[in-house]
Curated annotation (Swiss-Prot):
It is a multi-pass membrane protein. The chain crosses the membrane at residues 39-59, 64-84, 102-122, 134-154, 291-311, 322-342, 630-652, 656-678. This is Probable copper-transporting P-type ATPase B. It comes from Staphylococcus aureus (strain MRSA252). Its EC number is 7.2.2.8.
Amino acid sequence: MSNNKKHQNHEHHSHQEHENHTSHGNHEHHHHGNFKSKFFISLIFAIPIIILSPMMGVKLPFQISFTGSDWIVLILATILFFYGGKPFLSGAKDEISTKKPGMMTLVALGISVAYIYSLYAFYMNNFSGSSTHTMDFFWELATLILIMLLGHWIEMNAVGNAGNALKKMAELLPNTAVKLIDNNQREEVKISDIHIDDIVEVRAGESIPTDGIIVRGETSIDESLVTGESKKVHKTHNDDVIGGSINGSGTVQVKVTATGENGYLSQVMGLVNQAQNDKSKAELLSDKVAGYLFYFAVSIGLISFIVWMLIQNNVDFALERLVTVLVIACPHALGLAIPLVTARSTSIGAHNGLIIKNRESVEIAQHIDYIMMDKTGTLTEGNFSVNHYESFTDELNNEEILSLFASLESNSNHPLATGIVDFAKGKNISYATPQEVNNIPGVGLEGTVDNKKLKIVNVSYLDKSNFDYNKEQFTNLAQQGNSISYLIHDRQVIGIIAQGDKIKESSKQMVSDLLSRNITPVMLTGDNKEVAQTVAEELGISDVHAQLMPEDKESIIQDYQSNGSKIMMVGDGINDAPSLIRADIGMAIGAGTDVAIESGDVILVKSNPSDIINFLSLSKNTMKKMVQNLWWGAGYNVIAVPLAAGILASIGLILSPAVGAILMSLSTIIVAINAFTLKLK
């Protein structure tokens, strides 16, 4: 867990520093295995129909007929219509019941018209005594249903693969774990029988069964499949581990801290599913267009039928145009254009430690002008080392001043506090338990140690309260990149401590990448101006706001937004919550296993600045795929529907219902495959 996550609400600020893959049409309840089995069983019924029934009245070389063969065709076609056509008939019923007719209704209309008219043709040819032969559509019906089933089987496979990364995450957790019971006895139990505070043993190469803390042993953990962290992470006593990560070479004993739905993986999958079910503006638009497409297709189909009846007075040809228009129109390709990309995008993000909670953030990311970042823990490591400490009173020596600093900070998890306490421990300097400790927002904290009322404050507090202090010493230490805190007792400055933080290796590259994208990085920090400027100059950041109170960050974001600029704020999900909410995109960095942060639109599990660029890249690639799919889904229908209606019949370009079904299936498959090719970078 990152340090900037741990400091909770300790406003020490230097002391101030401190994204179901979607509903696929109306056949979401069908598993691709159902379409597969239906296809092969339907194939058994369809082959005799194809052999015994002429195509559009034209007998093909391989076709045969004999006395009673038309009865066999009728019986097999009826079975095929109700069995093979069932998914489409059921889907149409669902769509109509929700008053959202779409692809399933169009297909159901197409096969129903073909079947009913073929029944009429069968009656006319066998019972009416008419000398004229009425052409049936049994051949078209059989090929239509076969192609539709095959298309949906392939499509469901492609759709399933779009969310594959999420599926892989779900498979990371083992089914059993080795639990330690009385007298260190080991017992293999089901994961469902593991409870909080149980101790489990994980051997080399095994998956960590639950989130927990190592209580014995040390190892290297492979978290690549869980958080996207490519390097193995060394873990030892008291370190957090994530369920689903892979243990390296050592055997460790882990105390369980979260199970089931409270575990990291479950939270991530829940957030991703929620994000995938929320509709973005682009998706709402595509849904609307897909809805209109049904009425457009039916209208064009009926118009084409009437026009061809007037032109040719040929019911067979006119009916063929109607059926072809109904089956070639594909609102499904349009309806899936965005959800499939979203399923792929949010899954890839989760797999790489980028949890996209708010889908609209992906769209907004294309228009970001400024990215505002906290300094400590975002641009810097947040691991402070003490570089200088000194007493300003004859009554206390330097070590005693250090002890008072450590005492007052001992209950805090803020990075500065942790740095002081760890330094005191390293020098074997004892410290007392503080009493009546309170945060002073944007300043530091106050409390009582050994009956002394003390305050730890920053330089802004000294200036505002007119304290006398050595300004030359402050400037020298600050220019070296130190965060400086002062100890006050009885309105006297009695001590100083200076702590240095290290800039993260990937911060400079991140800033460079932002500038190359015409995005301006802005540093917002509670630290002193000298430290802020030193870090900013090293990173190449020209826009710096220092010595800020927590509420100042939010008002700065508002100021930038008032000029029409789009802002992304990157910071701690707890202390920076108001700023994250105020920004157009709030990105909580270094969440660790606590991904259920309310204030972030995007949650970065790691504290790696390069993930900011990864999010921007993923957003850009996602939008590119969405636009491609929308153009394909809309463009296909604009071209295919008029062709099916016979607009180019005068030059001999006529599409049969079977070809229409092939094109319709291909349109959806192309959209699915295009979504599947989405990559992080």
